[in-house]
Swiss-Prot record:
Keyword Protein biosynthesis: no
Annotated organism of origin: Escherichia coli O7:K1 (strain IAI39 / ExPEC)
Sites where the protein binds Mn(2+) 1: D200, D277, E279
Catalytic activity as recorded in UniProt: Release of an N-terminal amino acid, Xaa, from a peptide or arylamide. Xaa is preferably Glu or Asp but may be other amino acids, including Leu, Met, His, Cys and Gln
Lineage of source species: Bacteria, Pseudomonadati, Pseudomonadota, Gammaproteobacteria, Enterobacterales
PROSITE patterns found in the cross-reference section: CYTOSOL_AP (PS00631)
HAMAP family registered for this protein in UniProt: Aminopeptidase_M17
Cell compartments where the protein resides: Cytoplasm
InterPro entries recorded: Leucine_aapep/pepB, M17_PepB-like_N, Pept_M17_PepB, Peptidase_M17_C
Protein known as: Peptidase B
Length: 427
């Protein structure tokens, strides 16, 4: 077995020979990371990415300066989808080691699930993986129901059925109930709704190759809220929470939905389809209707929903939308506590009316006259939240996945957002 490369931390600057701004240096004992107090976690993560790039696949985090957050920052940068890596962790107290172990188990699950090829991860497989993860941490405190295929149509889940019917792999709705009280009549504190498009070709509004090649990751919202619930449970979540995952492929076939089709939802809303590549909101609508029916204090939906959010924020921040200023502030406070990047974008009442249709109440996409695509998408979703002005958060997951490596991340999924949502649930 290869001897581990020892990684230590220092608050002293590197020797001048390494350069004025050197963040790490190498000596006979191993590698030293030089912290400057400005962005130590970011520095550690970027250094870990460089260490991996050197081909070093076995490391030992050594010394007393490591804590759970610093270990986690290292792992976020060190982990990559190809190859194997081994880390010998430092001695941590029991609470910190448990926190680190839970992050490794759950957030790595999120990253690995998002990175999985669409051939291996269809709608049914995604739903079952979510059940397995939650059951592993919740035991008998969880029950669930899986509805698929024509049963969705028969039960009125017309958005999910319409989008998913073009694939040989049936669309699936997972409804999972985490109820630690044991009381079947206990109120539901929160509902989490996730977009689980396991591959998005764009449908008849087909994507170009450059925009389709990462669309195995279009189920990132579903993976994120699943991970968030699991992580909140490990942190002692003692309130009832329901999870709704809307899982489907968006493909082209003789049975696929078409431009001009009209979908009638269970809440009476009629939606004209004018872009089959704006399918995420169509499946989320069904989940939000179910979530609203639970009368929870809090509804959070998460989706890799729009390119507009990425245009605004890149892949560095998740976009947050809400009519509830106090709730948005709470989530941003949770994000700050967990050192995860969220940024609030505008959502106003007028965005709800910027989806006009000549044949239905709503269009599933905005026109050139209304170019605020991320905000109008959130406005669309609000039509399916019963009390949309209070207790509802929409997360457009622009920081879920990276097509190419950068200085702090490998290519692929990041797992960002899991800890923030879990923090909010357990606050």
């Amino acid at each position: 077995m290869t001897e581990a490369m020892k990684i230590t931390l220092s608050t002293q600057p590197a020797d001048a020979r390494w350069g004025e701004k050197a963040t790490y240096s190498i000596n006979n004992d191993g590698i030293t990371l030089h912290l400057n107090g400005a962005d130590d976690l970011g520095l550690i993560q970027r250094a870990a990415r460089k260490i991996d790039g050197l081909g070093i696949k076995h490391v030992q985090l050594s010394g007393e300066d490591w804590d759970a957050d610093r270990c986690w920052a290292f792992w976020q940068g060190y982990k990559a989808p190809k190859g194997t890596r081994k880390v010998e962790w430092p001695d941590l107290d029991d609470a910190q080691r448990q926190e680190l172990d839970n992050r490794l188990m759950i957030i790595d699950w999120v990253r690995d699930t998002i990175n999985a090829p669409a051939e291996e991860l269809g709608p049914s497989q995604l739903a079952q993986r979510a059940v397995d993860l939650i059951s592993n941490v919740a035991g008998d405190r969880v029950t669930y129901r899986i509805t698929k295929g024509e049963d969705l149509r028969d039960q009125g889940y017309m958005g999910l059925h319409t989008v998913g019917r073009g694939s040989e792999r049936s669309p699936v709705l997972l409804a999972l109930d985490y109820n630690p009280t044991g009381d079947k009549e206990a109120p539901v504190y929160a509902c989490l709704v996730g977009k689980g498009i396991t591959f998005d070709s764009g449908g008849y509004s087909i994507k170009q190759t450059a925009f389709m090649d990462s669309m195995k990751s279009d189920m990132g919202g579903a993976a994120t809220v699943t991970g968030a619930l699991a992580f909140a449970i490990t942190r002692g979540l003692n309130k009832r929470v329901k999870l709704f995952l809307c899982c489907a492929d968006n493909l082209i076939s003789g049975n696929a939905f078409k431009l001009g089709d009209i979908i009638t939802y269970r809440n009476g809303k009629k939606v004209e389809v004018m872009n089959t590549d704006a399918e995420g909101r169509l499946v989320l609508a069904d989940g939000l209707i179910d979530a609203s029916a639970q009368k929870p204090e809090l509804i959070i939906d998460a989706a890799t929903l729009t390119g507009a959010a990425k245009t605004a924020l890149g892949n560095d921040y998740h976009a947050l939308f809400s009519f509830d200023d106090a709730l948005a502030a709470r989530l941003l406070a949770s994000a700050s506590q967990e050192n995860e990047p969220f940024w609030r974008l505008p959502l106003a009442e007028f965005h709800r009316s910027q989806l006009p249709s000549n044949f239905a109440e709503l269009n599933n996409t905005g026109s050139a006259a209304y170019p605020a695509g991320a905000s109008t998408a959130a406005g669309f979703l609000s039509h399916f939240v019963e009390n949309y002005q209070q207790g509802w958060l929409h997360i457009d997951c622009s920081a879920t996945y990276r097509k190419a490596p950068v200085e702090q991340w490998s290519a692929g999924a990041t797992g960002l957002g899991v800890r923030t949502i879990a923090n909010l649930l357990t606050a």
